UniProtKB/Swiss-Prot annotation:
Quaternary structure and partners: Monomer or heterodimer with PSP-I (depending on the type of glycosylation of PSP-I).
Keyword Protein transport among record annotations: no
Annotated organism of origin: Sus scrofa (Pig)
This protein's GO CC annotations: extracellular region
Free-text tissue specificity from the UniProt record: Seminal plasma or sperm.
Protein name per the record: Major seminal plasma glycoprotein PSP-II
Family: Belongs to the spermadhesin family.
Sugar-modified residues: N119
């Protein structure tokens, strides 16, 4: 395994260990501003077509986010990740992939889930944690 592919997998495994403290669940969590230093987000409220979560770390931290596996119905639903708020730059709309990792440029990252009405929702799980300055991973 090349070093370039080993790093995302190592990050995913270490993230899964770190996030046991704060799991975001329940339909009332959609639209929440999350200030936990680590946790996970999943689409537990499958009735909503559109949902956003904003992760806010301490001012001196960046947000590290990892999606171990994503298998949404492409063309019918997607997850979009923003560096900062919804008005910030988008990393793109994602519907499938594995070992997907993002690092914010500041202390905020926003996740948007969007689904075309009338289509069923696919499950997903996203891990996040705060990264201090100077740490590579």
């Amino acid at each position: 395994m090349k070093l370039g592919t080993a790093i995302p997998w190592a990050l995913l495994l270490s993230t899964a260990t770190l996030v046991s403290t704060a799991r975001i669940n329940g339909p009332d969590e959609c639209g929440r501003v999350i200030k936990d230093t680590s946790g996970s987000i999943s689409n537990t409220d499958r009735q909503k077509n559109l949902c956003t979560w904003t992760i806010l770390m301490k001012p001196d931290q960046k947000v590290r986010m990892a999606i171990p596996y994503l298998n949404l119905a492409c063309g019918k639903e997607y997850v979009e990740v923003f560096d900062g708020l919804l008005s910030g730059p988008s990393y793109g709309k994602l519907c499938a992939g594995a070992a997907i990792v993002f690092l914010s440029t500041a202390n905020t990252m926003t996740i948007k889930y969007n689904r075309i009405s009338g289509n069923s929702s696919s499950p997903f799980l996203i891990y996040f944690y705060g990264s201090s300055p100077g740490s590579e991973y």
